[in-house]
A protein has these predicted regions:
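Retroviral integrase
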Residues: 1-144, 201-207, 212-318
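Charged alpha-helix within mobile-element recombinases
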Residues: 113-195
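Alpha-helical scaffold segments of alpha-solenoid architecture
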Residues: 175, 183-210, 214-218
Length: 318
């Protein structure tokens, strides 16, 4: 495997080098009330190659003008990138065929517009999706869960744009690594720190998952979709951090002072429960299966299978 490109390892401003990808289609209604029509819209994803920050834009259709407007919205909010990486639109999957044909059809106009803005538009070689793994992972995190969360629900373009923005906040709140190696520091570094300089915090809202669909207003249904997305995303993200191995030997690599995520199925959106390992408690066979964790609300005891270690600076550099 080759070395990481310089855009991935050179410190600089967020969204200076970005990866671009499309996902969809998502089916929405053109207006509220009776007589509405079902139309398509798409998700345009921008991911920062340095800090894995994600920006989501709803695109009304696959035209050059619609994409350029979404790019202008991105530049207005995140700043102008120096280079944009994208695939070349070659897709075998039927659902992605129209997206691929759009990119191939507008290859030259997109490059011309980017060059006018002093942006270097780069396309990866054909049939090499692994060259764009960082934005493919972002699309997977957003698209697959959004499809399962939305299901057969048909929202308006404005409601879908709001949902995309809330999903973006969830993805940008994920813990990357501890802020420091101090055992008393219970804060973690997230992509949100590079965007606004502090963690992203959501407004408190009541749990709507157990309320009947017919009793919810449109705004409450949108909030319910967000809460559903949070639960699914949290479980999938935690499973990526955990190593699925058999418990025949002591495979725990937790040490005192490590920062961990506490798996909690009832955690509200954007509320990641973090803590530091105070003490490992061995069993009669000498294998530790339980640990005392220092959190902002005191010391708690949790099984190791409910703890996910955040990578340290040595892990990231090694």
């Amino acid at each position: 495997m080759g070395n990481l490109p310089s855009q991935r390892i050179t410190p600089d401003y967020p969204f200076l080098s970005v990866g671009l990808d499309f996902a969809g289609p998502f089916y929405i209604v053109n207006r509220k009330g009776r007589g509405c029509r079902i139309v398509k819209c798409y998700l345009c994803l921008f991911v920062c190659l340095r800090y894995k920050c994600i920006h989501l834009e709803a695109v009304s259709d696959l035209t050059k003008d619609a994409f350029i407007m979404s790019l202008k919205r991105f530049i207005s909010r995140r700043g102008k990138p120096t280079e944009i990486f994208s695939d070349n639109g070659t897709n075998f999957v039927a659902a992605a065929k129209e997206i691929g044909s759009f990119i191939k059809r507008n290859h030259e106009p997109l490059v011309d517009f980017a060059s006018q803005q002093s942006i270097n538009f780069k396309f990866i070689p054909a049939y090499t999706p692994h060259f764009g793994g960082i934005w493919e992972a972002g699309v997977k995190s957003a698209k697959h869960l959004l499809r399962r969360v939305l299901g057969d629900s048909h929202v308006t373009f404005e409601e879908l744009s709001t949902l995309f923005a809330q999903v973006e906040a969830i993805l940008n709140s994920r813990p990357l690594c501890p802020l420091s190696s101090s055992p008393n520091d219970l804060l973690s570094l997230s992509p949100g720190h590079f965007i606004i300089g502090r963690p992203l915090i959501a407004l408190p809202t009541p749990n709507l998952e157990d309320v009947k669909e017919s009793q919810l207003r449109r705004y409450e249904r949108l909030e319910r979709l967000r809460q559903h997305f949070w639960k699914r995303w949290q479980k999938e993200y935690l499973s990526e951090l955990q190593q699925r191995t058999k418990w025949r030997t002591n495979t725990s690599k937790l040490d005192v002072g490590d920062m961990v995520l506490l798996a909690d199925d009832n955690a509200p959106p954007l509320a990641w429960k973090l803590g530091r390992v105070l003490r490992l408690i061995p069993g009669p066979d000498g294998i530790s299966r339980v640990a005392d964790i220092l959190t902002t609300k005191g010391c708690v005891r949790r099984a190791l299978v409910r703890l996910c270690k955040l990578p340290s600076a040595e892990d990231l550099n090694g």
